[in-house]
């Protein structure tokens, strides 16, 4: 089916779709929590979503384009589900978050389809994929429009790979409950298969296609492949609920890697962002024979999951994401917080025990989601731990340096 026709079919004008901020029914406090986080962005007065300029720019979205779309959303006079929040326009129309970002993505998609130069076309497809992904953000369960735009993001991501100098393979993995899971294997032009491979574990509010930059700029130049798998309840893994066994899907993928001819299953490491670090560190404990090393940035493995004061300071969107992932969209806050406690790797009896898998943990000072103690706990639990402090200013440059250091460390551990 042609891309243009697909978008027309998916997005027939309709005003009865549930608005994103109404999907989780916990007690929204509707007040600015003044949260500033390198990996999650900023809370902004009168916005439901956290505005994540650093990561969106890092993925390749033009900062001016970000402001242009945000201004279109902010100016809308259409009906809102909450008149205090700018990004809550009801229905797929002008001013709606998903509509405006998807509209921007469709412009790049059209440009890609008309472009003759392969490199330019590939970049335009990537631009479209990034914008479609932001349209679906924060990817809450049951968000019909977001689920539709995620289809466009994946299609655009696959189209980009046809034009750019790397190989993308869509892999299917059989899961023990009878389901089939899909992941993307990115292979570099440097070296030859089987490749040393990094298994990517992203955050709770991201898609597996959001980490192309990590592969292109940090792993591919070292001849390292990247395998991406969505966290349970997100994207291609949406049929599975996130449980206390957070590494359930990734562990089965790891166990299947000896059957993948393009991957050197004896040289596999795991990289976790935010809650993805929970999965990554868990794998380091459960699969030490299969995992050469674990790296994580801004890990969420204990503190936020157990500290009630920190949880109370979380923005509404982030609590909604947690509730959505845990399948607790209707639960009272107290019940949700009690359940979150069970996801702590320390509560589960893992962190704090000695682990032979080398682990690197990067942290930002005054990170509201992941304090320095979180990273120190991971490093001190490993027989070969490395603590990586990351300065907050200049934010973009230091994020880049942290990724350079982390990718070099992973390469060294997979030699």
From Swiss-Prot:
<comment type="similarity">
    <text>Belongs to the FrsA family.</text>
</comment>
<protein>
    <recommendedName>
        <fullName>Esterase FrsA</fullName>
        <ecNumber>3.1.1.1</ecNumber>
    </recommendedName>
</protein>
<comment type="function">
    <text>Catalyzes the hydrolysis of esters.</text>
</comment>
<keyword id="KW-0719">Serine esterase</keyword>
<dbReference type="InterPro" id="IPR043423">
    <property type="entry name" value="FrsA"/>
</dbReference>
<dbReference type="InterPro" id="IPR029058">
    <property type="entry name" value="AB_hydrolase_fold"/>
</dbReference>
<keyword id="KW-0378">Hydrolase</keyword>
<dbReference type="GO" id="GO:0106435">
    <property type="term" value="F:carboxylesterase activity"/>
</dbReference>
<dbReference type="Pfam" id="PF06500">
    <property type="entry name" value="FrsA-like"/>
</dbReference>
<dbReference type="InterPro" id="IPR010520">
    <property type="entry name" value="FrsA-like"/>
</dbReference>
<dbReference type="InterPro" id="IPR050261">
    <property type="entry name" value="FrsA_esterase"/>
</dbReference>
């Amino acid at each position: 089916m042609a891309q243009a026709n697909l978008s027309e079919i998916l997005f027939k004008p309709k005003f009865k779709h549930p608005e994103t901020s109404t999907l989780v029914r916990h007690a929204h406090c509707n007040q600015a929590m003044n949260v500033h986080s390198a990996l999650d962005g900023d809370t902004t007065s009168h916005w439901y979503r956290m505005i994540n300029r650093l990561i969106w720019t890092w993925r390749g979205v033009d900062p001016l384009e970000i402001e242009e779309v945000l201004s279109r959303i902010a100016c809308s006079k259409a009906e809102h589900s909450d008149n205090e929040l700018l990004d809550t326009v009801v229905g797929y129309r002008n001013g709606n978050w998903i509509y405006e970002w998807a509209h921007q993505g469709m412009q790049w998609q059209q440009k890609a389809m008309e472009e003759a130069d392969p490199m330019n076309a590939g970049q335009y497809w990537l631009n479209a994929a990034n914008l479609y992904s932001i349209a679906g953000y924060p990817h809450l369960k049951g968000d019909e429009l977001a689920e539709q735009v995620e289809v466009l993001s994946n299609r655009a991501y696959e189209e980009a790979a046809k034009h750019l100098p790397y190989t993308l393979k869509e892999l299917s993995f059989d899961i023990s409950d009878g389901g089939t899971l899909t992941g993307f294997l990115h292979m570099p032009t440097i070296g030859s298969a089987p490749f040393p491979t990094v298994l990517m574990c992203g955050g709770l509010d991201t898609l597996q296609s959001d980490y192309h930059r990590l592969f292109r700029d940090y792993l591919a130049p070292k001849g390292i492949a990247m395998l991406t798998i969505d966290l349970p309840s997100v994207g291609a893994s949406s049929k599975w609920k996130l449980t206390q066994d957070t590494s359930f899907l990734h562990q089965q993928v790891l166990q299947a890697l000896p059957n993948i001819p393009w991957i050197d299953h004896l040289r596999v490491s795991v990289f976790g962002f935010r809650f993805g670090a929970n999965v990554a560190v868990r794998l380091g404990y459960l699969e030490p024979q299969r995992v050469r090393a674990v790296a994580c940035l801004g890990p969420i493995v204990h503190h936020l999951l157990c500290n009630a004061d920190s949880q109370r300071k979380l923005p509404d969107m982030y609590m909604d994401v947690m509730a959505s992932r845990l399948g607790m969209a209707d639960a009272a806050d107290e019940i949700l917080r009690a359940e979150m406690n069970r996801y702590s790797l320390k509560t589960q009896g893992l962190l704090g025990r000695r682990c032979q898998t080398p682990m690197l943990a990067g942290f930002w000072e005054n990170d509201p989601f992941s304090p320095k103690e979180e990273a120190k706990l991971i490093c001190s639990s490993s027989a070969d731990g490395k603590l990586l402090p990351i300065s907050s200013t200049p934010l973009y440059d230091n994020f880049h340096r942290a990724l350079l250091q982390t990718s070099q460390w992973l390469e060294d551990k997979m030699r």
